[in-house]
Amino acid sequence: MADSETLALQQQAERLRGWRDGFQAVYVITTGVQTGFFDQLAAHPQGLTAEELAQRTACHAPYVAIWCGSAYRYQLLDTVNGRYVLAPHVDSLLVGRAHPDSQAVLFLNAVREAGPRLARQADYMHSGAVGSHAEAYGTNPTRLDPPPNQEALQQRLWQAEMQSRVPALAAALHNGGRVLDVGCGPGLMLLQLAASYPNATFVGVDVVEVGGLETARRLIRERGFDDRIHLECVPAEQMTYAEAFDGVLITRVFHEIPVASRVGLFRACYRALKRPGVLLNLDFAYPDTLAEFREPLFWSGVDNQYREMSWGTVHPTWQEQQQMLTAAGFAAIERHFVRHIPQGTHYLAVANKR
């Protein structure tokens, strides 16, 4: 075997080993979240020994020592004077779930929900069986009781990524405008907008009750927004609103809409908008070309497509989305990449009704 061939083989072998290591790192992180190890280390910035960490979490000391070594190996922990401390930014990313960049819940979901499903992918390949997002949402604790960072993320998405691209909509909201949130789920974007624009009113639609509208109703009632946020359980393509809204939001849900319903959904959104009005659709960036499958901008979409294919997820390409928006009547369609989301890069489509 030529040296170049040996090198190439070893490079590929190292890549595969890295993926195996990453798999184990997911479980090291999840264990640290579930046991409270990260929380305790954040509460003691001077550091803890493995024995002290075991005592404070009522865990088996020899196993905790092994966990600390593994977490140090993955650069989740550092040491100061022989005591373990959190590595930089781990407190924001894995502790105290109010930070918009927190990934603690994503790791929990990966182990509790995605892992078992991915272990059955070979069976799905043979059977072609399809589940549903609604079934999964009804058992997902982050949908039933959303962690604080999810609201913080919605606030940042609006303020940092959306608001500046639709100044006319922002002005309308200040002056008592009206917005429709399609696929509103537990209502987190609605809550943020209602708090930011006290003169505006909002409507949220979804087809998921448990883990969706049921949670939204509770949160809206608790925040005292009952008089300004109305919820409706209806498939979005069956909405009958006509020139009723200044803006329509679809936030990270379009890939879940059945393919046969997508043009109908955009047409219903177009009818629902006043003239002028604007639609904002934020979703995973998915490749148009084979070359884009190897571009990091699109990896979150590629990974999500594989992870959710047995739920019936079909990610649209940008070209497909443009064609659907145009067929629905929208004009001046723009795409903006949004990178600062814990789940990875998304894109924001801005489409206008003129």
What are these regions (language model features)?
Residues 175-185:
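Conserved class I S-adenosyl-L-methionine
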Residues 328-354:
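Core SAM-dependent methyltransferase catalytic element
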Residues 263-275:
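A short glycine-rich, Lys/Arg-flanked "PGG" loop and its adjoining helix->strand segment in the class I
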Residues 186-198:
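Conserved SAM-binding loop of SAM-dependent methyltransferases across substrates and taxa
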Residues 237-248:
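A short acidic, Gly/Pro-enriched loop at the edge of an enzyme's catalytic core
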Residues 195-236:
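Class I SAM-dependent methyltransferase SAM/SAH-binding core
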Residues 19, 23, 31, 70-177:
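Conserved Class I S-adenosyl-L-methionine-dependent methyltransferase catalytic core
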Residues 282-328, 333-337:
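C-terminal alpha-helical "lid/dimerization" subdomain adjacent to the S-adenosyl-L-methionine
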